[in-house]
């Protein structure tokens, strides 16, 4: 029994693997390209503070989040780093952003004027990166003449410092031709702005898959996200790089019972036992990360043996067919990670639904405690906050 547990279902994060992943990414991009670590949604629900501490110790200076609230949490812990909010920030939050030296994404001349006025009132310079829509059709200035004129006007605002300009790939692996076109649209537009006197310290468009498969698109800065944590949302990984998943998800057996042939298991009597079955119950369910669509599809590891989940996954519990496997209440079960010679990968789980690794990870519920290990020793828990 692990004496640090506060719940019999939990996540373990390997900080050594995370550190190795960050070193590998730095090796991929080289010394001339700045690495902006994407830690939005609390580092994809894996813990922005403990993971960013590792990155800061490795010399990484730039971080990206989705919202100002995420940026302010980071700023409280890391007063010296540079933090970019990738998404929209409402005008009423401009003052907090300026006072805390948060870099904002801008794609509106009107917003820029309001931001400039607020910075002037505070006797500060507002820091911004300009977003360009090169084909994602999400946010950003379009690449038209009017946009160039508006961006030039933003450059002329005295209390705004335009540090960077960026765009985002829509289909980096699945549509390389469209990706190339996006890159060309973006860089051509930036070159045209430069001819108008608008120069940028950082140009960035490369995301995780671009970093892996298209180093020619790195420019001055890259924004790796999911690959930092050892996952790719891809069927392929370049052999020269060693990225490892940092997550293990485990639970303890809560119940063991013998169910007779012909009897049923779970809600709606969804599973009918075709033989006498040893049914193990685990204390986690769809409120923790495993949606019902995965019912009767996933496997878990019990004492090194693969065992099938049976019945409908419940909100807080799921049942497992452990027939023929020696086990006891309290035994550790692996739902993601390694046990003995077997391994359950997040990608395996995602193959049973339309989900991707990025999406699956961000469904890890806050009630699952997270424990962080370095050199196989527990060094931090989100319960210490």
Task: Please report, for each region that a protein language model flagged, where it lies by residue.
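Conserved PLP-enzyme active-site core in the AAT-like
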Residues: 28
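Active-site-proximal beta-alpha core segment in soluble small-molecule metabolic enzymes
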Residues: 2-5, 10-12, 17-20, 31-204
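Active-site anion/phosphate-binding pocket segments in diverse small-molecule metabolic enzymes
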Residues: 2-15, 19, 69-70, 89, ...
